[in-house]
Amino acid sequence: MSHVTLIGDRLASTGTEFVYEGESVACEGCPYRKQCLNLTEGVRYEITDVRDDGQLLDCAVHDTGVRAVEVEPTSVVANVATREAYAGGKAELPGSCPHTECPSHEYCVPDGAEFDTEYQIETVHGDPPHEHCQLDRELTLVEFKPPDTTSN
């Protein structure tokens, strides 16, 4: 389901993905709070449309202002334990990893997914980018289904 929100003008491009981090202290007293702070914290979104006819509004967070966009929750690609990697099944992230130089690190600690949270697997992609996990984990690359945010 699509949501209309405000986003920094530099980020306002169809296809841009971001994780909504919530309110900044600079948002206090802003007249656009209701239109801007209307997404679910920690969820990854994709901009599906930029309201070009919309006005560019001043913002204390974004130096070039904000504009209206349509966004939808989007999937998160992640590594999970191979034994849990079944399309339609549920899995959790395997746990934190200190090996930031590993080609799989962005999938072991993906933006838009939290540890100790179960996600539904939409697609199984297969082998992860790394050749060997330095933590000796057997991992498979999957895509988590976008969360249902209709309660927002």
UniProtKB/Swiss-Prot annotation:
Top-level lineage group: Archaea
InterPro entries listed in its UniProt record: UPF0179 (IPR005369)
Pfam families: UPF0179
Coiled coil: none
Cited HAMAP family: UPF0179 (MF_00498)
Family: Belongs to the UPF0179 family.
Protein name: UPF0179 protein HQ_3004A
Native organism: Haloquadratum walsbyi (strain DSM 16790 / HBSQ001)
